[in-house]
Amino acid sequence: MSSLGDQIRDWHRGVLAVAREDWDSALCFFSDVREPLAKMYFNMGCVHLMAGDPEAALRAFDQAVTKDTCMAVGFLQRGVANFQLQRLQEAVSDFQLALAQLRGNAAIDYTQLGLDFKLQAWEVLYNMASVQCQAGLWTKAANTLVEAISKRPEGAQDTLEAAMDKVQKQVPLQLRQVPKGEVFQPPRRYLKHLEPMDFLGKAKVVASVIPDDHNSDIQPQQSSQVEQAGLQSSSPVCKRVLSTRGGHMSPGLWDSLLATGGPVPGPSEDSSSAEGTATKDPESLVTVTVQCHFTVPLKVPRGTDLSSFRTLLSQALLQQTQKGQFSYKARGEDRAWVPISTEDSLQSVWRNVPVSPRGLQLQCRGAWGRPVLYQVVAQYDYRAQRPEDLDFRQGDTVDVLCEVDEAWLEGHRDGRVGIFPKCFVVPAATCVEALPVPEPQPGEQH
């Protein structure tokens, strides 16, 4: 059984095959996707049309609009297939269905859904007039064009006036359809994770214990200040952190030390001499507690031993910390986490750290190497309608990775990334009692 990654890869390969006009390969890749979505059937229908097989295209578009009964562009293309098969009544019906799915809007822009095409209401009416011309209904065709002109489409006035002139001369009109080569593409955020990631990297010697090693790229190993102070003791900074709260460490800080290969601390002890070596001003040190939350994708050989697995995980966590979003806990009643997005904001945090054993509390969050902007709490249950959606239940906390537009967010929860309606959630700091689930608005469908 193919994985989600394999299916996305086949989808992408199919798109590339369409770009080079290799119709057979494109159909093969699109057909390999298990349980195809409406988008995939739509792609296959478009390929069949480009390959000159309207019968096969009609079957594919039938599947597409069955899977997604609101796919206006699917009804448009099915109407084109019916027109090419001289099924004029069915073609008119499909164009009427496409117009109905526009729901009074002047256009539907499919760009955000992966198709570089904007379906215009006037184009659907234009196609209806074209079918009426083919049936010899010239008066009806002229009336349909008048309706299209009444919608005042931007940039289409000349096209419609030229079409009206042809109809008056009883010259047939050519159908308008999705441009050749345009199909639904997989979301870019999925494509970024298709290539295998090398978490170990390449080994490189940066120091040698052999004094006579003359390799120009290698420097003799030097004794560090920590070694001179005594290798048996922890670093001054670690001691400073551990000297508070009786030597107890927060789980997030413990994980971050393990991930970076730092020394595993022992019980708290007097560290005055070590602090004198590290800095002349002990007050310049701040106790920082970092809570780390990461979702780490790993590719591990089956049967990997525990030690090797820990090494892989520590390397992956180290990379995640380079990309994670830092936040600090604000003062006040809500105690919300405020993102640290710039160097200036971090310096402002340092200036306002209170002088107390509690010190500074930070949070570092990341999802698949992507920073978390902020968190939201679900006010209602949301069931995923498509693979790119992220479902959740009332009360779930979701990490927001991107604000797609005014109505949609991209988020992460339980190792999964997807998009969801903004109206189903509220910021974590302002969570209120849930209200009845709102009815979806036409503009929120995708």
Curated annotation (Swiss-Prot):
TPR repeat positions = 7-38, 39-71, 73-105, 122-155
What's the record's remark on domains?
The SH3 domain mediates interaction with NOXO1 and NCF1 and has autoregulatory function. The TPR repeats mediate interaction with RAC1.
Alphabetical keyword list: Cell membrane, Cytoplasm, Membrane, Repeat, SH3 domain, TPR repeat
User: Lineage of the source organism?
Assistant: Eukaryota, Metazoa, Chordata, Craniata, Vertebrata
Self-association state and partner proteins as the record states: NOX1, NOXA1, NOXO1, RAC1 and CYBA forms a functional multimeric complex supporting ROS production. Interaction with YWHAZ prevents the interaction of NOXA1 with NOXO1 and RAC1 and its targeting to membranes, hence reducing its ability to activate NOX1. Interacts (via N-terminus) with SH3PXD2A and SH3PXD2B; the interaction is direct. Interacts with RAC1, NCF1 and NOXO1. Interacts with a greater affinity to NOX1 phosphorylated at 'Thr-429'.
* Highest taxon listed in the record's lineage: Eukaryota
**Where is this chain compositionally biased, Polar residues type?**
217-232
Q: What's the protein name? A: NADPH oxidase activator 1
* Originating gene: Noxa1
Q: What is the protein's known function? A: Functions as an activator of NOX1, a superoxide-producing NADPH oxidase. Functions in the production of reactive oxygen species (ROS) which participate in a variety of biological processes including host defense, hormone biosynthesis, oxygen sensing and signal transduction. May also activate CYBB/gp91phox and NOX3.
Native species of this protein?
Rattus norvegicus (Rat)
* GO terms, molecular function: enzyme binding; SH3 domain binding; small GTPase binding; superoxide-generating NADPH oxidase activator activity
In which family does this protein belong, per the annotation?
A: Belongs to the NCF2/NOXA1 family.
Q: Which GO terms describe its biological process?
A: regulation of hydrogen peroxide metabolic process; regulation of respiratory burst; superoxide anion generation; superoxide metabolic process
Pfam hit, one? SH3_1
**Boundaries of every PB1 domain copy:** 287-367
Question: Mind telling me which PROSITE patterns this protein's record contains?
Answer: PB1 (PS51745), SH3 (PS50002), TPR (PS50005), TPR_REGION (PS50293)
- Annotated GO CC locations: cytoplasm; NADPH oxidase complex
Instruction: Give its localization.
Output: Cytoplasm; Cell membrane
